[in-house]
């Protein structure tokens, strides 16, 4: 067609003008939808469907079937955009001179066919794509004979779906960016980002990263007697579970629960051999922490022995250990058979391996791992206990637990004798009373606001009522009061105060 073939203001002129406007609008829709729909990943839409806002969920449900076949959608939109852009100069050339047709067509296509539609659809691509999903389906049907063969060729060359999942490092960076500490408007707190990062890192950590070496654990020989000195060491250690070994600390055969010692009287000097020794699972040195956590979740034990090959482990612990009383062990080469190791797990086959009284020749215990160790790796922070002394294993830095207002170090004691660190206490109180003080719950500790102390573990015979330790204000010595006498004194004091 030559220039000015259609006279101005005639019917065909308006028809051609409407066609040009329609082509510009159609090209703009195709360009905007190409950017808006193709920028939405399948994973992002699935997340919106499961956890998005109600209106976003509806929009994602409409768009997801279209985006699943990405190559077909891409070919359809590009073919429609190309046809509109190629047809527009033909109709504009019928209305304007050549130079005017080039200027107007380039301006219309650039402004209204590319820049504005892509800017709007990049911002509101989800809502616009959902509202125009019916039109997109109609266009796919119209251009299906052209777009389908090209899309199948792209599927063959590039693959049907492109991976949009993030790796672990990318997820950690994404979580950190969503934290409020990053300053980008995220809602995740420091604890949330730390725990999520710890959960992602735990799959790459094994038992050797969280265990406590054998040389640093508190354990007892099975031949030890539970006298006052042993009970004092157990109380000062502050552990709820204590590993038990046979002669050599590397030959761990099980563990005992400290709460089971509440009925043990130190004057009886009960042997550890006579106590119920629980079986301890054994885990490989390179076993992932998640597998260890699954073992702990079974409820059979919250402590496991970490074993390694003797050729790859080197422990400096001597074979002949001295007992608490100072006498060396005589049966250094004898392995003990413990009848108390029987448990409910022996009645059926279990995939969990346990430490036996006789270990494998190529294996030896190199450390202990507990549920607390695994949880510390998960939250990436130390779990402080009210009795332990803390040493960071990897950096060898002593960590002091911050004192609270209720801690014994900051409390006001009724007298110098009431404090467990008093220099007068060791000379006036027997070791049994000292042990009971160490085992006393901090809730019932002898602070000034509480005069009643928790009964000792062994000071009273079974047939007698538990004694209560009370300070004498006159001579600062301790004597025993029965519960009835304490209540009677309190009642008399209350009566005098009411009478006055």
UniProtKB/Swiss-Prot annotation:
Domain CBS: residue ranges: 211-275, 276-319, 326-386
Membrane topology note: Multi-pass membrane protein
Transmembrane regions listed in the UniProt entry: 13-33, 72-92, 96-116, 138-158
Glycosylated residue positions: 311, 342
UniProt keywords, alphabetically: CBS domain, Glycoprotein, Membrane, Repeat, Transmembrane, Transmembrane helix
Segments on the Cytoplasmic face: 34-71, 117-137
A GO biological process held by the record: magnesium ion homeostasis
Extracellular side: 1-12, 93-95, 159-500
Gene3D superfamilies to which the protein is assigned, alphabetical: CBS-domain
Disulfide feature: none
Domain CNNM transmembrane residues, every copy: 9-192
Cellular component GO terms held in the UniProt record: membrane
Pfam families: CNNM
Localization (cell): Membrane
Primary residence: membrane
Name assigned to this protein: DUF21 domain-containing protein At5g52790
Source organism per UniProt: Arabidopsis thaliana (Mouse-ear cress)
């Amino acid at each position: 067609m030559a220039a000015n073939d259609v006279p101005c203001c005639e019917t065909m002129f308006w028809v051609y003008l409407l066609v040009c406007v329609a082509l510009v609008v159609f090209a703009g829709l195709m360009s905007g939808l190409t950017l808006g729909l193709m920028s939405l990943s399948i994973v992002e839409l699935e997340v919106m469907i499961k956890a998005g806002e109600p209106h976003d969920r509806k929009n994602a449900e409409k768009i997801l079937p279209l985006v699943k076949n990405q190559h077909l959608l891409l070919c359809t939109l590009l073919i429609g955009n190309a046809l509109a852009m190629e047809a527009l100069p033909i109709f504009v050339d019928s209305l304007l001179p050549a130079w005017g047709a080039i200027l107007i067509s380039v301006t219309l296509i650039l402004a209204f066919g590319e820049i504005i539609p892509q800017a709007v659809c990049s911002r509101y691509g989800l809502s616009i794509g959902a509202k125009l999903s019916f039109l997109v389906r109609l266009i796919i049907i119209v251009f299906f004979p052209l777009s389908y063969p090209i899309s199948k060729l792209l599927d063959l060359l590039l693959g049907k779906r492109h991976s949009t999942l993030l790796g672990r490092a990318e997820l950690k960076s994404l979580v950190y960016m969503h934290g409020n500490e990053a300053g980008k408007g995220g809602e995740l707190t420091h604890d949330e980002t730390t725990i999520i990062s710890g959960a992602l890192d735990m799959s790459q950590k094994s038992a050797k990263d969280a265990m406590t070496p054998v040389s640093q654990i508190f354990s007892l020989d099975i031949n030890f007697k539970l006298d006052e000195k042993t009970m004092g060491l157990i109380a000062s250690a502050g552990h709820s579970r204590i590993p038990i070994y046979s002669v050599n600390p590397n030959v761990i055969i099980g563990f005992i629960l400290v709460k089971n010692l509440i009925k043990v009287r130190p004057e009886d000097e009960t042997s550890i051999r006579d106590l119920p020794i629980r079986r301890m699972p054994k885990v490989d040195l390179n076993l992932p922490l998640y597998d260890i956590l699954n073992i702990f979740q079974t409820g059979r034990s919250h402590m496991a022995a970490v074993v390694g090959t003797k050729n790859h482990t080197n422990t400096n612990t001597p074979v002949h250990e001295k007992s608490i009383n100072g006498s060396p062990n005589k049966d250094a080469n004898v392995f003990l058979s413990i009848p108390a190791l029987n448990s409910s797990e022996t009645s059926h086959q279990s995939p969990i391996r346990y430490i036996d009284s006789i270990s494998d020749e190529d294996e030896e215990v190199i450390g202990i791992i507990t549920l607390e160790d695994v949880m510390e790796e998960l939250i990436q922070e130390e779990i402080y206990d009210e009795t332990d002394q803390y040493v960071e294993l990897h950096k060898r830095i002593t960590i002091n637990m911050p004192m609270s207002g209720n801690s014994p170090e900051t409390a006001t004691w009724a007298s110098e004798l009431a404090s467990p660190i008093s220099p007068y206490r060791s000379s006036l109180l027997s070791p049994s009373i000292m042990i009971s003080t160490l085992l006393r719950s901090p809730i019932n500790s002898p602070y000034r606001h509480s005069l009643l102390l928790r009964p000792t573990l062994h000071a009273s015979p079974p047939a007698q009522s538990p004694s209560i330790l009370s300070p004498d204000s006159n001579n600062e010595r301790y004597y025993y009061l029965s519960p009835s006498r304490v209540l009677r004194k309190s009642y008399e004091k209350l009566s005098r105060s009411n009478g006055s």
